[in-house]
Amino acid sequence: GFHAMFSHQGRMVFVDPLRNGEGYAVYYQQDAHSRLEEEADRVIGSKASKLARQVLVDGNERKRYVIAISAAGEYTQYHGGTVEAGLGAITTLLNRVNEVYQRDVAAEFQLASGNDTIIFTDTATDPFNNDDGDIDANVTVQQNAQTQAGTKLGPFDIGHVVNTGGGGLAGLGVLCTAEKSAGMTGSPNPVGDAFFIDYVAHEIGHQFGADHTFNGTTGSCGGGNREASQAWEPGSGSSIMAYAGICGEEDLQANSLPYFHSKSIEQMRAHMARVASCGTSQSLTNNAPQVAAGNDYVIPANTPFVLKGAGADLDQDPLSYTWEQIDLGTESFSVASMVDDGSRPLFRFVAPTSAPERTLPSLPSLLTNTLAKGEAWPATNRELNFRLTARDGKGGVSSDDMKIQVVNTGKAFALTSPLVTPLAAGQTQTIDWDVAGTNAAPINCSKVDLYMTRDEGVNWTLLAGGQPNSGSASVTIPAGSDGTARLKVACSDNLFFAISPLKLSVTQRVEGGGGGGGALCFWTLALALLGWQRRRA
């Protein structure tokens, strides 16, 4: 049947035929089937060595690898029971995996010639058991399909097998090696991104040399599945090589985001370089994006901050950006332990955006005064390392790193007044904040800028810039319609800021006039004051 996928307003939309053949399902990625029933994958082989940071993907070359994908009889039966139906399902799967690998690591897969000879239709006579033992059987099946008389499976660089009951299992860094067929994925519902991304792209990532990126140890994140040298993501993590949805209370979300962490890209590109003679190189008319993460800073503990970078592309391609924390530390073992202990990662991986900025903790968390899972206040004297990564969508991926030194001054830089008092448009308002030692070394913030938002942080109006970081300043509240607002005090030459914890009411100043206007003004103000007092009571 017809299969399609496209991007709509930054979200992936899929079109797949219903199994009864009586129509089509159109759905967003996050509405796909849930992840594989709390099944963890396993990694076979030695752990990859820790790598130094490097330019990720140049963008002017793409590697094409030939892949052989075997299908157990149960997988083929799920998709209609014929070789043609099984081959069509594998083609749909590969199209989705290709989209991710082309964009993130400049690699793509071409199905091996004669792949139909390793798609089995009979569950009783096929060479597989529909479990994780199929990974060993697959090595033999694919070797025999190339060597036995009467078979016609062509040469390939990487092999995999799909079934409906085996979970995930793969050899680490086996692409273009003698163990190249050591990869398998199984699910009772082998369709959609829960299968294509969470499992198949994940297991092939292992075959490319990428290890797990989660730092949690509950649920399936336990049992030795955490890899300390690559545990960049809090809790279950959310990138492809993490374990979103199968780590119990440490789950950040139900399914993986369809993106690799930059550290996974490093590992995969390193293995691709080690087997550089394998695969076919394709020249691209493309330049890698340019990206700058900005300067290093010193900030106070328990205080929000915003990371700001910049990017450009010689080809004028629209860029997408991710800010990732790249710190390794102590594993977490519960939600309560996902806090700052001086070493562990504090901030989760999030999907790329069109702007090279990220507010930490996230703005929704600040507005609700409730941290999202996968966010924690930097509370100790420590160093935070961050990476800005830019993607051009064509395989060009560039990154730049910066660091933040966190200093616990004993207090948070925080707005202290007004907290509930309404604001009067057109009138002078005094804003107070706790300096928290930020005007002294080593932070040395001497000036602050004061802002107001009427739309919960979508837009900010500058009220006064370059004011002394003394803890108090007077500003004029802009004229405008009645409503609500929040205030912000931000260090002029640093990243940290303080924001109103609650919405503040804004009312219009009533101007006096001739005749009875003065009396009207008096009674209007009196009634307004009475209303304020009732609201505060």
Where are these regions (language model features)?
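A cross-kingdom C-terminal cell-surface attachment/processing module
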Residues: 521-536
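Fold-level signature of zinc-dependent metallopeptidase catalytic domains
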Residues: 23-175
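Proline-centered linker/hinge motifs at extracellular inter-domain junctions
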Residues: 285-290, 319, 388, 410-413
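Extracellular acidic, Ser/Thr/Pro-rich low-complexity tracts
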Residues: 299, 310-315, 392, 434-441, ...
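The catalytic-center signature of Zn2+-dependent metalloproteases
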Residues: 112-136, 174-258, 324, 329-333
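Exoplasmic/lumenal beta-rich domain surfaces
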Residues: 110, 320-380, 449-473
